[in-house]
Amino acid sequence: MNRIVHLALKVEDLEATTRFYQEVFGFREVETKKVRDHTSRHLTDGYIDFALLKYDPASDSKEKNAAGKGPCIHHFAVEVDDVEAATRQILAHGCTIVSDPGVVPVKFQAPGGTIAELVPKERYKKQAG
């Protein structure tokens, strides 16, 4: 069964946003890493991967502003058994691929404009709480 496993926010202040979610909601940091043109800090509540994305100011990638120019909910991820098959399905439904060719996860613009991504099983491993 496919399910939502990840939610990402685009933020301007990574440290202040991290502190807020840790201090107010008790989220735990899983990892922080540099990914192409942004820093991705992954938090969890024990069930879902919650990423805070801080894009490089000079970045002009399609992904950076796909969901909006300022801070916003950037995208959510759906875990699928077969990323290639799911990609064919979303294309058949008129979706536009936003991520660079060959990049997994596959970010796309769904009907209505929402940005989502397809991820393989177990991409986001939570630290049980």
Regions found by a protein language model. Name each.
Residues 1-16, 73-78, 122-129:
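N-terminal beta-strand motif that seeds the catalytic metal site of vicinal oxygen chelate
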Residues 8-50, 98, 104-107:
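Core segments of cupin and vicinal oxygen chelate
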Residues 13, 82, 110:
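Acidic di-acidic motifs
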Residues 30, 42, 87-129:
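Vicinal oxygen chelate
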Residues 37-38, 59-64, 125-127:
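A short, acidic/glycine-rich surface segment
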Residues 46-50, 56-59, 82-84:
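Short, charged/polar surface micro-motifs in flexible loops or helix N-caps
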Residues 66-68, 97:
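Short Gly/Pro-enriched turn/cap motifs at secondary-structure boundaries
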Residues 69-90:
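Mid-chain, well-packed structural core segment of small domains
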